[in-house]
Structure formats: structure tokens, C-alpha cells
Regions:
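HIT superfamily nucleotide-processing domains
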Residues: 1-132
Length: 132
């Protein structure tokens, strides 16, 4: 994971608060959380985005997502749902060019209208009417 020739934040900084890890990935609570217990799941190998992950890395990351989810539900009984997402590319909002997946706990009332969930990345597309 550490490479002195790579300036990547996730490869070289001293990551504090590693919640869990396995051979291929680790989970760390976000320094700038959207909500309490917002967690990042990060592959140990330096890859730019989700589409570069191997099948084994995808499984390792998903395993950590499940572990962290259960841990959060034990810590905070008010968590009722989650958003899971990754930004792949600068135009999609990726600011650290090392793949990472956000696990964001959601609580009832944390936003006025949660309809559309991750669709809110483009605000005018967040709210919609079902055709069925």
C-alpha cells in the first residue's frame, strides 16, 4: 500500500481510524463525513477507479461494506438505510484519484425529501414521477 514514489493520499498518508481491513482493501471513516459514520472502502492496490478493480478486489471491498454496515447498525439504532457510491472520474466528482467507495448511513429526516437518492448528483433529476 505504501509507495514513496506515489503521491496518492490513500497510498502514502498515515490513514488514521482504519475500521477494518482484509488482504486487498481497508475501510476508514471519512475525514469530511456527509453523515456520522460515513465510511470509505479503499482498495490497497493503487487503481484510479472502480472499473480498474479486479474481481477479487471487488469481492474484498464488498465484504468490507457488509462488515461496516453491520457495525454501524449496532453503533447507531437511528440508521435506517444507506447510500453506497463511487465517483469514477473528475467530471463525476472524483477528487482523489484512487478508487474508493462511500458508505453513507442515512437516518429518517436527514433530508427533506430523500426520493431519488443518488440521483441527486444532478439536482433537477432527483425528483421524478413513476410511470407505473
Amino acid at each position: 500500500m505504501r509507495d514513496p514514489n506515489n503521491p496518492c493520499l490513500f497510498c502514502n498518508s498515515k490513514i488514521s481510524g482504519i475500521a477494518h481491513e482484509n488482504d486487498l482493501a481497508y475501510a476508514s471513516y471519512d475525514t469530511y463525513p456527509v453523515s456520522e459514520f460515513h465510511c470509505l472502502i479503499i482498495p490497497k492496490r493503487h487503481v484510479i477507479d472502480y472499473f480498474e478493480l479486479t474481481d477479487e478486489e471487488l469481492v474484498a471491498c464488498n465484504d468490507l461494506i457488509k462488515v461496516i454496515k453491520e457495525e454501524i447498525l449496532i453503533k447507531d439504532k437511528n440508521v435506517k438505510a444507506f447510500n453506497i457510491g463511487t465517483n469514477a472520474g473528475k467530471i463525476a466528482g472524483q477528487s482523489i484519484m484512487h478508487c474508493h467507495t462511500h458508505l453513507i448511513p442515512r437516518r429518517e429526516g436527514d433530508v427533506e425529501n430523500p426520493q431519488g437518492g443518488v440521483r441527486s448528483v444532478i439536482p433537477q433529476k432527483q425528483h421524478y414521477k413513476r410511470k407505473i
